[in-house]
Amino acid sequence: MLIPPFILWDVGYSVYTYGSIFIIALIIWQVKRSHRGLRMGPTKSCAKCFRRIKQTPSDRATRAKRTSKEEAEKLQKLLDTMKSQGWLPQEGSVRRLLCPDPSCSICNAMTLEIQQLLGVENKKTSSSLLRPSRSFSCLEALSPSKSLADRSSELTYQDTRDVSLSSRFPQSQETDQQSTRSATPSIGDAVLQCYHSAPQQQLDPQGSKMTQDAKGLSSSSTDEPGVPANQQKKRKKTKKLALKNQAAPTEVETENKMTFFSHWVNPEVKCDRQEESLVFSKYDTGAKPMTVEPEKTHSPVRDQAEGAEKKKKPECDLKAKPLRAKRNI
């Protein structure tokens, strides 16, 4: 049993057994871990994936914004420095500096970008220069608009004034016509009353005065300012006709009164007119002062008949007239 091969066998056997047990334990532990990982691992990993998926677009966007802002700021700084130093290149010189080959796509793209940047700067400068000019042009545009508004207000005021005057003038014309119409009959009545009450010597000056007053009224009413000439002519014509109508009955009445006074003073005076017609004319003149007796047309047959009748009646008239005169005394 103390032989060396047996000792190695005994040691190797123990090592082999313990090593095999250890290896089996490791395998079991690994299997269990993998089994637990299959159960618990997917939920955690999915949650982490979802979180990464949710966070990545926002992070990318913010990062892109930040980078774009930084790049824009850098370009602005470069352009400011170039402006301050006067290093802004012209459009043709940029392409010459990059590449002599005109068909190079990269150089052409770069020149386009540079032109865009230079164009933006030029626009900014032009806008800053145009702002005061625009404000000045706005002020200039406002000044003529104000003048036009003032002119329009003046025109509207003049139009309203003309309309008001035109609305007033017809009323004044109507009132003048009514006053003249009311004045003409009243004047005629006053003239007739004066003829009835006063003798012949006082009638002539009063009639002339009344006619002068009527003429004064007509002239004052027709010569008003603002009345057209056609209306003034019409008024003058109507007033002349009214005055003629007033003058005609006064002449007839004076002739009748003269004959009546001559009979009263001297009853022996012969007159071809009948006294009844005189009395009738007295009572009729007060009621119808404006009427004028129409002129009788004379025919030879009627004149002969009337002459024969008048020759028969003179004696009767002479007898009747003294009696009436005595009664009046």
Swiss-Prot record:
> Mind telling me which residue stretches traverse the membrane in this protein?
11-31
Where is this protein found? Membrane
InterPro entries attached to this UniProt entry: SPATA31F3-like
Protein's membrane topology? Single-pass membrane protein
- The organism sits in which domain of life? Eukaryota
Q: Residue ranges under compositional bias (Basic and acidic residues)?
A: 293-320
Comp. bias (Basic residues): 232-242
- Major site of localization recorded for this protein: membrane
Residues modified to Phosphoserine: S152, S153
What does the entry list under GO cellular component? Answer: membrane
Q: Which residues form a coiled coil?
A: 58-85
Region ranges (Disordered):
149-184, 201-250, 288-329
Give me the stretches of Polar residues compositional bias.
154-184, 201-223
In which family does this protein belong, per the annotation?
Answer: Belongs to the SPATA31 family.
Name this protein carries in UniProt: Protein SPATA31F3
